[in-house]
Amino acid sequence: MSLSIDVTSLPSIPSTIYKNESSSTTSTLSGKSIGRSEQYISPDAEAFNKYMLSKSPEDIGPSDSASNDPLTSFSIRSNAVKTNADAGVSMDSSAQSRPSSNVGCDQVDFSLNKGLKVKANLDSSISISTDTKKEKSKQNHKSRKHYPRIEAESDSDDYVLDDSDSDDGKCKNCKYKKKYFALRMRMKQVAMQLIEDL
């Protein structure tokens, strides 16, 4: 079984904001958590502050906000730096400045260049042979010894064993069966005589 996954030839995904003009700013995805920290220090900030301070509070409207002012919004975007959200350390070497003709245009190009290859080889073979088992069973039959069966019959019906005997019938087919029962009868008689004497 072989599995191969190749994602090196994925196309880049451009996202253009405001206009269809191109830009040289490229952001690359990272596995770490990245936040955006905006810096508002720029030459345009001083001019914007003077403009805002020169107007009365009643005259300031939504059109005077930083997001609607092209120069100020451009300076905010151009001076924004990538930071690690956990440590707060800047991850950009320098902020890139753009020409004034690109005010209001921002394009971010996310490119993914990764290679992933997975290979798994599964080779298995199973062979089952029953010939050796048959040979072993034949050898077992040959190795068994057949002893002659000895059968003995009692002359008297008194010597027939029943299931209640204490010896569990271990001497049922014994050649000393007749002598055994005779001895047992004598032992019973002796035991009964002792009980009577006491």
UniProtKB/Swiss-Prot annotation:
Subcellular location: Host cytoplasm
GO biological process: viral genome replication
Region (Interaction with VP1): 1-48
GO cellular component: host cell cytoplasm
PTM notes: O-glycosylated.
GO molecular function: ATP hydrolysis activity; magnesium ion binding; nucleotide binding; RNA binding
Keyword Repeat part of the UniProt annotation: no
Keywords: Glycoprotein, Host cytoplasm, Host-virus interaction, Magnesium, Metal-binding, Nucleotide-binding, Phosphoprotein, RNA-binding
Biased composition, class Acidic residues, residue ranges: 153-166
Cofactor(s) recorded in Swiss-Prot or TrEMBL: Mg(2+)
Binding site for Mg(2+): 92
Top-level taxon: Viruses
UniProt keyword annotation of RNA-binding present: yes
Phosphoserine PTM positions: 67, 154, 156, 164, 166
Main location per the UniProt record: host cell
Region Disordered, residue ranges: 13-37, 53-72, 129-167
Subunit composition and interactions: Homodimer. Interacts with VP1. Interacts with VP2. Interacts with NSP2; this interaction leads to up-regulation of NSP5 hyperphosphorylation and formation of virus factories. Interacts with NSP6. Interacts with host DCP1A, DCP1B, DDX6, EDC4, EIF2S1/eIF2-alpha, AGO2 and CAPRIN1; these interactions are probably part of the sequestration of some host SGs and PBs proteins in viral factories.
Described function: Plays an essential role in the viral genome replication. Participates, together with NSP2, in the formation of viral factories (viroplasms), which are large inclusions in the host cytoplasm where replication intermediates are assembled and viral RNA replication takes place. Orchestrates the recruitment of viroplasmic proteins such as capsid proteins to these factories. Participates in the selective exclusion of host proteins from stress granules (SG) and P bodies (PB). Also participates in the sequestration of these remodeled organelles in viral factories.
Similarity comment: Belongs to the rotavirus NSP5 family.
Name of this protein: Non-structural protein 5
UniProt source species: Rotavirus A (isolate RVA/Monkey/South Africa/SA11-H96/1958/G3P5B[2]) (RV-A)
